[in-house]
Design a protein with these regions (language model features):
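Gly/Trp-centered helix-boundary motif
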Residues: 1-238, 242, 391, 395, ...
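Alpha-helical transmembrane segments of integral membrane proteins
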Residues: 34, 44, 167-170, 177, ...
Length: 453
């Protein structure tokens, strides 16, 4: 196989490296580690962090791309498939390759729509055909309930065995987590819930379509897991674009004041006066026109979809920095009047050194709180933009495209509800975990909130 590094792959690896570096810096500085210990002592924060790490792990696995090798021809030269795959695709191959003809309900053994079937005696009747893969191992369909129960119990047993293999050594050596008992309990219970769910899915997914299939017969569970990367990337990469603009302009406006402050205020006031959805839609349509007129820029469809996703992150970042910039401007106006900042200016310390050593450390809590609180909003923004047709590439799997595809399915009779339900369930868990973690981070890092409580 030939490794492939897309633009968003490199950026997500950069973000992971930055997160690891941030953890190392925090552990080496007591004044930085103290508030994060308060976060780690909160059971809700620990549980939410474990869920977010699980989603992030899936996104990273889906960012390790490659092009599979084709059988060697007569020339002996290595040939590679034009389709770009990921490590997650390789892991999900047992369910990705099990494609049916069209819709089927969760755990169904027959298609959702009737078709003309020719019987053994030559008669043609309209009935629900048997699925090729869903329950295809069953000789008698009446055994389905017992088979699902048996496989679910095996999956639960496997998940519990893995959990015990992790928990018992850590508990015996008392190194589970250097925080309170409540956080330890939340950590291990959350890991247990994730492992039990994973065990059940591993046991059932190769034999049944757990969340059914869509219009083209694709397994909805596979599409939902592949959509996680898009949601995580939208939230993470947009933040990567937002932070430099918000920090640079917001802190500069508050510290220097005068004309700099006037220009920055005029800039974000003008941006806020433009309806956000219209501004984003106009920018996306311009970008889409540019990509369609230059198809020679891309070797594969995955590269084209990836570049569109990257541009969408850039557009969202350049239109969402105003709120954080306004908060940083207000906080910097207060910090610049503190005694140690005034003393530094009196001793001739340069403005750049004052900003780096005195101002930025005192506004970092606002940055961190804003980052974690905006993440969930950006995930929802992708769903809304894809729903109105100006989101990610239609061929890319995402929660927004799944919801957009389910819109017409809800209007048919009988209703095809499972694609919308699957996208809603996974997006709900991701956004809820992000919101709960953001609330805990805000409570731990905001000094005003701690004093008032």
């Amino acid at each position: 196989m030939m490794p492939v590094v897309l633009w968003t792959d490199g950026l997500i690896f950069l973000l992971v490296a930055g997160l690891v570096g941030f953890v190392v810096v925090v552990r080496r500085n007591e004044h930085l580690a103290a508030p994060w210990r308060r976060v780690a002592a909160d059971p809700v924060a620990v549980a939410a962090a474990v869920v977010l790490l699980c989603f992030t792990g899936i996104a990273v696995l889906d960012s390790l791309h490659f092009r599979p090798a084709l059988p060697t021809g007569a020339s002996g030269e290595a040939q590679y498939a034009p389709e770009v795959k990921s490590l997650l695709d390789r892991l999900l191959a047992p369910i990705a390759e099990r494609q049916e003809k069209t819709y089927s309900a969760p755990f169904a053994t027959r298609l959702f729509a009737k078709e003309a079937i020719t019987l053994a005696d030559g008669r043609t009747v309209r009935d629900y055909p048997r699925l090729k893969y869903g329950g295809g191992h069953l000789a008698d369909e009446s055994e389905r309930a017992g088979d699902i129960l048996q496989r679910s119990l095996l999956g639960l047993a496997g998940g519990l065995a893995v959990w015990l293999a992790l928990f018992l050594p850590a508990h015996a050596k008392r190194r589970a987590f250097p925080v309170g008992e409540g956080s330890k309990r939340a950590l291990w219970l959350t890991v247990l819930a994730i492992l039990l769910t994973t065990g059940v899915l591993i046991a059932l997914a190769p034999h049944y379509h757990v969340f059914g299939t869509d219009k083209v017969g694709q397994d909805v569970l596979y599409a939902t897991l592949k959509s996680i990367r898009t949601g995580v990337l939208i939230g993470a990469l947009t933040t990567l674009v937002t932070l430099p603009l918000a920090i640079g302009l917001g802190v500069s406006a508050g510290y220097f004041g005068g004309r700099v402050d006037d220009v920055v205020q005029y800039l974000y006031t003008t941006l806020n006066a433009i309806p956000g959805v219209l501004l984003i839609a106009a920018a996306v349509l311009l970008m889409q026109t540019q990509l369609e007129t230059h198809p020679d820029w891309f070797e594969t469809g995955a590269e084209r979809a990836d570049l569109r996703l990257l541009f969408l992150c850039l557009i969202l970042g350049m239109t969402n920095w105003t709120g954080l910039a306004r908060l940083l401007r207000g906080e910097t106006l207060k910090v610049r009047e503190l005694d140690y900042v005034v003393a530094a200016r009196a001793f001739g310390v340069s403005n750049g050194r004052i900003l780096l050593r005195h101002v930025l450390p005192n506004v970092q809590h606002i940055v961190l709180i804003s980052v974690v609180m905006d993440f969930s909003g950006l995930v929802l923004a992708e769903a809304v933009l894809s729903y109105v047709g100006v989101g990610v590439d239609p061929g890319m799997l995402s929660f927004g495209n799944m919801i957009n595809g389910a819109r017409l399915e809800l209007a048919r009779e009988p209703v095809v509800w499972w694609q919308l339900a699957a996208a809603f369930l996974f997006m709900f868990v991701l956004v809820l975990a992000a919101n709960l973690f953001a609330d805990c981070v805000r409570d731990a890092l905001d000094p005003r909130g701690r004093r008032s409580s």
